[in-house]
Amino acid sequence: MQTTATIKSAVTGVTLIAATAFLVSTIHAQDPAATKERMMALGKQHKTAADLYDALKKQAGGGKRLAYTSLPDWTGVYTRSRGGIAYDPDQKPGAPSTARLTPEFQKRLEKRIDDANRGIEWDPISTCSPPGHPRWLTEPFLKEFIVTPDRTWLINEMVNDIRRIYTDGRDHVPAADRYPLYNGDSIGFWDGDKLVIHTNQLTEGIYQRRNPDYTNQVETVEIWQKTNATLLEVDVWVYDPPALVEPWYTKQSYAKLDDQDKNLRIRYWHCGENQNNAVVKTDGGGSQFQGFTFGNQGGK
């Protein structure tokens, strides 16, 4: 016999799923500001990224595995279409981050910006470390996307930085086998032409220069959709309890480049392929070229 608590829990779960369905189904009917408010509210309805992902999956009837004949066309070469290097494209240049940070991480951000304003800035990718996810979304390099029924590859030009999204029905690896990874472990499902992704098992990092830190407890939920012939849009919710007071929602977008002559290519390159000396971190927390010299002094 069901207890009152069990029935209440079940009703609450159904209510949240229904609310999720309503919010997601109405987002395209709203102006951008109202849409963002609704999507932020959706994130706050769910305690964890896993909870939001599960609700979206239930709303989609469990999701589906696409056949090769029904795959969306994401071919081409893309670039981030707005936002500069701000993690939230709606953040105006010089304005505070739109993330609601815990006091400790707010202080970290303020120090990072103050240091940068004084010329003291360190970026892990200066020594060719991968940007990692969720920073991956903001990197200003060309991107390419390969979609198959069982997995989707999200490819960033720098060092062939690839996110692998498994859509064959598998779950995340068992908790006992997890450890932090730059791009984490990503599973997903298709809801019509929308790819819904949950990523966990991430390493700590920064969203971008002059942007906040994230911890190795960070997790994300993304909804990718091609909204017209040349635009891929992504709704992103970031959950990171040590750093964020509430989930951070942003909308990312990537524009397909004109390539009528088929000459555009994604090419492997890394930050060591330049004429500069090796970059090192200074004692003061900034960056400097090791043994830096201007030009060839005294050489041929």
Residue ranges and their predicted role:
Residues 2-15:
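Bacterial N-terminal signal peptides that target proteins for export
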